[in-house]
């Protein structure tokens, strides 16, 4: 069933609807514009110079992956005009009337299209975002009927953007392969027939941003993700299991790169899978475009390189589909346990109220 409305149409409301209100422990701890410079910004200029800067760039990328699992890249070779076109057309789409966007509603198991909000199956609280999803690679899996036809140029621009990002992702995976002592193509080959999904996120202004998230805390399941974000701010990362958070400083024209669970496992845990979330604000909307590079469903997941003195972090090889199902099952179980704990807490509070009443009131 298609959603009745869009977030854009309710962003003017003064009070946040209950379905978006998160538990206190999940609410933002750092402001969307309280920027940190802890995430490295790495220039890729000279990355193709085997005898030149490639070694230096490789060291910086590896250090970032071992420390945070997230870094930013500039001088990456993706045409600035293409980036501008992609972001401009995306904003045009989200500015369309609700009925136009809902023509491409993705509910009901459709492959690609428009989504109003998102949430984990079995979880009641929803994220404050609107989404357009394109499945871009393998090319044979593209279903252009699920790609919005407005603005008119967006489909063609998305094709070019997808091609550019595929090349950039493979280049970065090549650097990480070499760092693991493997052939340049090792990580790309481990993906078998690499899948690419482009997710365009639009975070409208929010009436009470301190009560919700644009995208809840998570790690990406795939190999590597390249994120293009505007200058508003809202991407946050943690490396101490959520005790402290930083807001990633937006850099004009840069891509934020983060490793996913698959990349983490292939490196035998050497490279971190970035733990991150997105927060929103009441001052302005925010746009980001995430390009997820994932392995084929049948790809075998197992460490490609185990360093001396270490043991494999997986007991046995599994398929990517099995890995993904385990991740989803774990997330659902955590959501179920949290729900039970909340219900128990509520019952305990009610019982405490009864226990503290005067005897005359209890038997009245």
Curated annotation (Swiss-Prot):
One example of a Gene Ontology biological process annotation: flavonoid biosynthetic process
Note describing how the cofactor binds: Binds 1 Fe(2+) ion per subunit.
Catalytic activity of the protein: a (2S)-flavan-4-one + 2-oxoglutarate + O2 = a (2R,3R)-dihydroflavonol + succinate + CO2
Pathway: Secondary metabolite biosynthesis; flavonoid biosynthesis
Cofactor section: Fe(2+); L-ascorbate
Its EC number(s): 1.14.11.9
Residue ranges of the region described as Disordered: 343-364
Binding of 2-oxoglutarate, residues: 286
Top-level taxonomic group: Eukaryota
Residue positions binding Fe cation: 218, 220, 276
Enzymatic class: oxidoreductase
UniProt xrefs under Pfam families: 2OG-FeII_Oxy, DIOX_N
Listed Basic and acidic residues bias regions: 348-364
Sequence ranges assigned to domain Fe2OG dioxygenase in this UniProt record: 191-295
Alphabetical UniProt keywords: Dioxygenase, Flavonoid biosynthesis, Iron, Metal-binding, Oxidoreductase, Vitamin C
Function: Catalyzes the 3-beta-hydroxylation of 2S-flavanones to 2R,3R-dihydroflavonols which are intermediates in the biosynthesis of flavonols, anthocyanidins, catechins and proanthocyanidins in plants.
Record protein name field: Naringenin,2-oxoglutarate 3-dioxygenase
